[in-house]
């Protein structure tokens, strides 16, 4: 059967409609979540094998070719023909189809919008619904995970894979994502009269969505759907609704919540800066403080500018002209005889001190009282130039023209130049402090009585200066030792001399002097230790009665049973040993002192025993029990300190090495300790453990004597550099107080045994009496109060008071001076 061209065109038109309906149905199906293939073939969505897809494609292509061949021919039409005729016929058909398609499009574009209906886009031959059409087909869903493998056909029939849509997330970059409507930069008004509004990425038309009625718009505003904005999307023509993600984002912003779910607002806090010391530095260094405070360098620059403006070094432009005019005016009126203008000196500039103005004694015609007598002139000339109060002698001239030139002007200028060059200048700021506030509040001396205030008795009789004195334990007898070689005993109340013994014959021996005398503290004996030269004499003065004198001599004689009389025992010597060192080990240490019986002449002077040492003995101090006494020989090296035992006639040296020049040594009042005073240090030794307990640092250049408080926790020391040092043994090794009241070397210091008094005597001829209270409370410091300054001894050869001693019970003080007298000071 042969069809005409008109029939063919009608058939082609119907085919176009069928294809359009199929395209619409295919779009509806593809918009669903599950994508389907409905070309008559069955595709297994669960299979991932490429061979299955290839076979499915071949079936689809074969079925399409069969259907097209069936549609293109009738049962009665001939199939045979030449290839050329077939090709010509196909070409004609294609041209006819294109022409018909263009005509239909032109007709559609020319029609109005209201002429389109559903029947124009429906299939006339088959009016069944899509569900019935698909009922006879086998369909399988393709999961979303395999949506990338869904394949369709292009317009020429070749297969194409439809890739899944890109779902942008927060971290993705969607700046290059193409929109659904790909018309480009063309105004949408060009599609106002068309059923579609553009084309998608696949080149298919995007049909204009149907518009609702006014009632629907009103209902939409009343019952707002989720994501409703009331706006119209110009690209799609539909209402612009917000997605759930956008609604969630807006809700979080309104609630001030975290927008990004990947950020944890409650993550654990990392303490970068802790109290624990880290090895490696932390990179998160905090901002330095200088970022938040004003800059010091800028402040300095600003102050420099301000100072320059104040000083006139920076002049504003408006004042510069005035200054120039004023300067020109001043140049015409210059005061030749005017004073020079003073310039502002630098802050670090220190002017040289001005010379003192001349006084009346420097006048060429001074008053008569300023002129020196011949005796004063001779005394001035004998003095050293450094000791003179003035470096010139006042002279009187009749007139000014008779005054000669000053011969010392060059020397004075030179000395002033040296002073300015060598002496540093210091600016001292005066402090406005009330001097009375610096004086500590001390109790009145009237409230601290009794203490010695006057001289009651003078013990005169010695022909040389009295170097030492001592009071016996009973407090009735005073012993003195003088450079005349005699020891005298005085009755303290009457000042009567009751005993005299010549120890040193000054005619034959002028080198030895009586250095010290000390009574034995035991009241049952009457022993007097006298140190003269290298010997120590123990005397028993016949003033105490038979019983006391007998006990004294008996105590000395009992020691002869332990005396070796110079025969020293040697250590055991091994005769079978050939070692040369054995003989050295068997040798005995040299004897440090000898206990000898007195000669007949010495016995007549009541000398009981004589102890001979190596060097001159300067100090003697008894132990409180009266059996031991210590002697000091400054020139004897490591044997400077010797401890003598009266009951055994034994002498031993406690030290093996010399600790400097020893000046004094005394026992602790009740502990087995020995205080050793050298020139600069005071050391305290424990005799029982034979260890050094403490070392005191007085800070003096040359110590002279020491004395220990009866409680044993405080000590005073005197020095030749005019200082008295109080040491608290419970505190530091440095002095608690330093007293500087004397003008010359301090010779003696001493504590009272019962009362809170102590004194110091010096070569200036004065004795200072102090009140010293030591509290039982360890938290309170000792109270030191100056009480009285006693004067009465005369100076002889720059020597004043040489020794002092307190009465055992009363507040009386005995002193020995270089004026050959001893004095008793009472209350």
From Swiss-Prot:
Cross-referenced InterPro entries: BOP1/Erb1 (IPR028598), BOP1_N_dom (IPR012953), WD40/YVTN_repeat-like_dom_sf (IPR015943), WD40_repeat_CS (IPR019775), WD40_repeat_dom_sf (IPR036322), WD40_rpt (IPR001680)
WD repeats: 461-500, 509-549, 657-695, 698-737, 741-780, 796-827
GO terms under cellular component: nucleoplasm; PeBoW complex; preribosome, large subunit precursor
Superkingdom assignment: Eukaryota
rRNA processing among keywords: yes
GO MF annotation, one: ribonucleoprotein complex binding
Region of interest: Required for interaction with NOP7: 291-409
Compositionally biased spans, kind Low complexity: 61-77
Comp. bias regions, Acidic residues: 45-60, 81-99, 108-124
Key words, A-Z: Nucleus, Repeat, Ribosome biogenesis, rRNA processing, WD repeat
Ranges of Basic and acidic residues composition bias in the record: 7-18
Keyword Nucleus: yes
Paired cysteines (S-S): none
Location (main, coarse): nucleus
Residues covered by region (Required for interaction with YTM1): 409-445
Residue span of region Disordered: 1-129
Family note: Belongs to the WD repeat BOP1/ERB1 family.
Cross-referenced PANTHER family: RIBOSOME BIOGENESIS PROTEIN BOP1, RIBOSOME BIOGENESIS PROTEIN BOP1 BLOCK OF PROLIFERATION 1 PROTEIN
Subunit structure comment from the entry: Component of the NOP7 complex, composed of ERB1, NOP7 and YTM1. The complex is held together by ERB1, which interacts with NOP7 via its N-terminal domain and with YTM1 via a high-affinity interaction between the seven-bladed beta-propeller domains of the 2 proteins. The NOP7 complex associates with the 66S pre-ribosome.
Name of protein: Ribosome biogenesis protein ERB1
Name of the gene: ERB1
